Design a protein with these regions (language model features):
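NAD(P)+-binding Rossmann beta1-loop-alpha1 motif at the extreme N-terminus of oxidoreductases
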Residues: 1-64, 68-70, 92-96, 133-136
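Interdomain hinge/lid region at the active-site interface
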Residues: 181, 206, 211, 226-336, ...
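Rossmann-fold dinucleotide-binding core
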Residues: 82-85, 100, 106-218, 226-250, ...
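C-terminal amphipathic alpha-helical interaction region
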Residues: 404, 409-482
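Small-residue-rich helix-loop
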Residues: 222, 350-383
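Glycine/threonine-rich flexible loop motifs
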Residues: 73-88
Length: 482
């Protein structure tokens, strides 16, 4: 097979097939390979006329069909299948060639793979791709890591297929080795928080205010005309308006209330813990999904018949209208906190791993193609560009003002929910994070005293430098300098 393709895709399931078609739609000559040739044939039979494809029956044929320096994008199952395919390609490729892992890989795996492959003279790029199957076909948000040299080759290819926001392609070089997959991981963590906050808003209106799904869908439609304008708010309205054709009931009332997850939210929280970065909103969103899936535990709790309010707020029409606005304000404030925490995790990791990540550019490429695309990402990008958000997004004047405007509503929502038995872990944890930041003194002083008591971990004093330890077991409990 002669070398004619400028890019290739390995793995032609939903995401890989859609990405290959997107590449072909934009003038790329695309080599395609799947372990089972039947899937390759299916792609060619159904979509072969959409562009220039070069189907390969073997991996050797696939590599031979690529113009040097070769670029192969793999979209296979995470874990061992990914490692196996990377190794197989590396054995057939030459120094200067590029292997791109566009799946949802855990960033330490990407760092490990990049180190191994680069030692052989090849380039390895971990690239986060957001937008699902539709995004892969019509234009995703792309977050490639890897070397600057590999980016020179990939830039025109990726810019041709990425989503566009205000005319700009939603792709940028994130940083070295695992930076791309790290940023995609945090993107997904923010997505978890965003979805949980929306779900809590729905629950407050459904159970608290007794509104129908269609009525709540109307509210979300109106909210999408405000600063909350986003993909997730938009699709929430559509889901809530959907009527089940079999029963005539709202579809949301027939969906089992167990929220699944694939692991990226968990990775975000685990990594934040290892970096000592509080991502409370994201963590509570992950835990809320876990609780939703504890079917036996929840069923037993129902049998226990615990005392407590039933969630009904019993508000009159004017109070109801005002509380819906409170929920909107609380949702926006909590959303700001989620993004602030996510960007803080990126900043901390960049220092830890030596990545030079342009946070303004990250915000810009999230404006289109990805699941968390939202109007206010323009504000976030501007805040980082100006330097106003260098310490925290919350300190940028626009977001500081938004938080202050929403504060009373935010507190009212969390307080009413607690008093009436409605769980709002994401709202409440976001508010607590905000209050923790604004507190001049935290009870951590007591915790450090306890740690010194049982473990001689020492403490610092507010009135003099140094580390100290109290001799707790001795009668006089003298303090010594450690």
């Amino acid at each position: 097979m002669s070398a004619e393709a400028n890019v290739g895709v390995v793995g032609l399931a939903a995401m890989g097939g859609s990405l290959a078609r997107n590449l072909a739609h934009h003038g790329n000559k695309v080599a395609v390979f799947n372990r089972s040739y039947g899937r390759t044939e299916k792609l060619m039979n159904e979509h072969g006329s959409e562009g220039e494809f070069f189907p390969a029956k073997t991996l050797e044929e696939f590599v031979d069909s690529l113009v040097k320096p070769r670029t192969a994008i793999i979209m296979v199952k995470a874990g061992e299948p990914t490692d196996a395919m990377i190794n197989a390609l590396a054995d057939l490729m030459e120094p200067g060639d590029i292997i791109v892992d566009a799946g949802n890989a855990y960033f330490p795996d990407t760092i490990r793979r990049e180190k191994k492959i680069s030692a052989r003279g090849l380039h390895f790029v971990g690239c986060g791709v957001s937008g699902g199957e539709e995004g892969a076909l019509l234009g995703p948000s792309m977050m490639p890591g890897g070397s600057e040299e590999s980016w020179k080759t990939l830039k025109p290819i990726f810019e041709s297929i990425a989503a566009k926001a205000e005319g700009e392609p939603c792709v940028t070089h994130i940083g070295l080795n695992g930076a791309g997959h790290f940023v995609k991981m945090v993107h997904n963590g923010i997505e978890y928080s965003d979805m949980q906050l929306i779900a809590e808003s729905y629950d407050l209106m459904r159970r608290g205010l007794g509104m129908t799904p269609a009525e709540i869908g109307d509210v979300f439609e109106e909210w999408n005309k405000t600063e909350l304008d986003s993909y997730l708010i938009e699709i929430t309205a559509e889901v809530l308006h959907q009527v089940d054709k079999k029963t005539g009931k709202p579809l949301v009332d027939l969906i089992v209330d167990h929220a699944g997850m694939k692991g990226t939210g968990t990775w975000t929280v685990q990594t934040a813990l290892s970096l000592a970065v509080p991502v409370t909103g994201i963590a509570e969103a992950v835990f809320a999904r876990g609780l939703s899936s504890e079917a036996d535990l929840r069923e037993e709790a129902q049998k226990q018949g615990f005392a407590g309010p039933n969630g009904e707020l019993n508000l009159n029409s004017e109070e109801k209208k005002a509380f819906i606005e409170d929920i909107r304000q609380a949702l926006y404030a909590s959303k700001i906190v989620a993004y602030a925490q996510g960007f803080n995790e990126i900043t901390t990791a960049a220092k830890e791993y030596g990545w030079d990540i342009d946070l303004a550019a990250v915000a810009r490429i999230w404006r289109g193609g990805c699941i968390i695309r939202a109007k206010f990402l323009n504000r976030i990008s501007e805040a980082f560009e100006s330097g106003e958000a260098n310490v925290s997004l919350l300190f940028a004047p626009y977001f500081k003002n938004a938080i202050e405007t929403a504060e009373k509503s935010w507190r009212n929502v969390v307080a009413r929910a607690a008093l009436n038995g409605l769980p709002t872990p994401a709202f409440a944890s976001s508010l607590s994070y905000f209050d923790g930041l604004r507190s001049k003194r935290l009870p951590a002083a007591l915790i450090q005293g306890q740690r010194d008591y049982f473990g001689a971990h020492t403490y610092q004093r507010v009135d003099q430098p140094g580390a100290f330890h109290t001799l707790w077991a001795e009668p006089g409990r003298e303090e010594i300098e450690a």
